[in-house]
């Protein structure tokens, strides 16, 4: 009885996601991409512009974006039309095209920093030989998104990864191509990642006539 009287109740554990919006983060719309890109250009944020454009074009996970090395995209001193990066999660290489504006942004960034092959493309506060952390990258993404009037809680690093993949799927309906571009091993993963519903599939089917 005495033990029951003196017993103190355990503090209630606060759920990690309390007050946070969870679930899949939606892709950015083209107008949002252009707004962020324009703002970064006007503000002269060369690193952020190069990173944002690379994230959109590459469709890489955040952990792979921050691990990009100069030689991955600019082995010859100038940014190439195509690049190949080995994914940390799967160990599989994934190839992607780099648009002209992305190549220009990366070249401008390389000129301003003097970075050379053999170095990390994006470094953080831990020193020139250490990559930016995924947490730092996530904070940057939130900053970019909030700077154009969007709610950072609704979007995240995966929003950038999904953006171009979603546009490609909506315009072509080619799920296999999107699977390859995202580096997924199973097409079911791509279906879930894009949030494809039966209605979406049927709408695409109606456009195909044989």
Where are these regions (language model features)?
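Conserved catalytic core of the tyrosine transesterase superfamily
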Residues: 1-210
